[in-house]
Amino acid sequence: MGLAAVGMIFENLRTACRDGGNLQAREKMSLASTFAGLAFTRANVGYVHAIAHQFGGRYHTPHGLANAIVLPHVLRFSANAVTQRLAQLALRARLGDEDEDDEVLAAKFIDAVEQLNRDIGIPTQLDALQEADIPALARAALHEAHTGYPVPRYMTQEQCEELIRRLLPKASAAPSSPAPTRKPAAKKAAAKKLTTKPAATKRSASKA
């Protein structure tokens, strides 16, 4: 069911987002959602949901949006442990050929997920995320994942924090500093000294 869901998502999600009136694409996405739900009800979820739950709890981020933002990062973290399965997903999404190496197909799948996010307007950062919150978010996510989810590769606290930190909003450009108010006065004083020095020299010359 999971494979079928992935195939339908890659075939229909862009169309459904671009053209909400396309009932065929929306019907396929509804079916894909149902299949995916049935699949993870049996196989359970992992770090994507665990981290996304923390974003929802702290920042009220919609769960689907949080999942989409986190997904590519967790896929890259877990890729070496699930290369063959990612390759199967790539084939189902028609992203490559069976004669390609699993590593190549797995990389294509993750790249395609990132491209799909871009195509439908999913942000790459979480605007509400605060640096100070990251340690607590990571601890809560790991507690959730490690007590009930069959994750393919375990994260440490440091690794989870690093992953979440990649989602911090880009720092806004620092505003240009106003010109110091004392500089003109300093320039004026310097100019005054320059004008008085020649006069002093002239007086010295007359005495001689």
Q: How would you label these PLM feature ranges?
A:
Residues 86, 96-188, 192, 197, ...:
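C-terminal charged capping/lid subdomain of soluble metabolic enzymes
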Residues 1-112:
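Active-site segments that bind and position negatively charged phosphate/pyrophosphate groups
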